Structures are given as structure tokens and as C-alpha cells.
Amino acid sequence: MLKEIVIQGKSISENSSPYIIAEMSANHNGSIERAFETIKSAASCGIDAIKMQTYTADTMTINCDKDDFIIKGGLWNDFKLYDLYKWAETPYSWH
């Protein structure tokens, strides 16, 4: 078993403090400026890394009005899957 790894100068082992990875998800609300502010805020809280899901609506689903593509129940009730993914997408151009 691997005893230790080092990521950007931080040792990760059985005896080190946890390496904390935060999930940004769609909390940027489509704004790259908000994404940067989220990353800065996470860093100021001691987060070691940010996990981002990079996708576009077209890579997740099709733009379809059939019932199988409409969310039923919950916060996103009656949202079309495509529209939800479009709202939450993290574009590849942000890299």
C-alpha cells in the first residue's frame, strides 16, 4: 500500500490531516466570475482542491419535450432535463 503522496507540496498519508476537496457543482450559476469567487472563498476556508464537473447540456441529454425528458416532482418539477443542464453547465471554455 502507498504510504504517502504529495500534491502541490501537501503530504497525504495515514498520519496527515485530511486533504479536503470541495464540490462546486452548478453553484456558479453560469458566471465564471462567481466560479472564481467560489474558488477563492473555498481556499480561504482551507479547502485543498475544487472538483468541477465540466459539461454542456448537449453532452448530457437531448433537447426533447417528451415525458421521459421532463422532471417530475421536487425542486425541478416540470423542468425539461435539457433546460436544467443548460442552466447548470460548466462550459469547456472555462478551462
Give, region by region, the residue ranges found by the protein language model.
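Glycine-rich phosphate/pyrophosphate-binding beta-alpha loops
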Residues: 25-27
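Glycine-rich, proline-tolerant flexible connector loops at the mouths of alpha/beta enzymes
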Residues: 48-89
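Aromatic/hydrophobic pocket-lining residues that form the small-molecule binding cavity
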Residues: 35, 91, 95
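N-terminal amphipathic alpha-helix/helix-capping segment at the start of soluble metabolic enzymes
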Residues: 1-21, 95
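Conserved, mostly hydrophobic/aromatic
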Residues: 23, 42
